[in-house]
């Protein structure tokens, strides 16, 4: 099956630049320690790289 990514917001977006806030919101994260699951594709990987210091990522098989 396709790989999926479990993305968890581990640091706050308070005081972060607007583009990083928008990226976190686009990933579907609203609250601290919230986890969302996305398909593993280049677009999602690019967003993760942009806010890598705010999130943790786990690869999961489904």
From Swiss-Prot:
Keyword Electron transport: no
NCBIfam families: rpmD_bact
UniProt-recorded name of the protein: Large ribosomal subunit protein uL30
PANTHER family per record: LARGE RIBOSOMAL SUBUNIT PROTEIN UL30M, MITOCHONDRIAL RIBOSOMAL PROTEIN L30
SUPFAM superfamilies: Ribosomal protein L30p/L7e
Gene source species: Geobacillus thermodenitrificans (strain NG80-2)
Matching Pfam families: Ribosomal_L30 (PF00327)
HAMAP family per the UniProt record, alphabetical: Ribosomal_uL30_B
One cellular component (GO) term of this entry: cytosolic large ribosomal subunit
An annotated GO BP: translation
UniProt KW keywords: Ribonucleoprotein, Ribosomal protein
Entry similarity comment: Belongs to the universal ribosomal protein uL30 family.
Quaternary structure (record): Part of the 50S ribosomal subunit.
GO MF annotations, alphabetized: structural constituent of ribosome
Gene this chain is encoded by: rpmD
């Amino acid at each position: 099956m396709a790989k999926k990514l479990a993305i968890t917001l581990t640091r706050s977006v308070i005081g972060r630049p607007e583009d990083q806030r928008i990226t976190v919101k686009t990933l579907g994260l609203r609250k601290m320690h919230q986890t969302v699951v996305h398909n593993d594709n280049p677009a999602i990987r690019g967003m993760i790289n942009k806010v890598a210091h705010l999130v943790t990522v786990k690869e999961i098989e489904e």
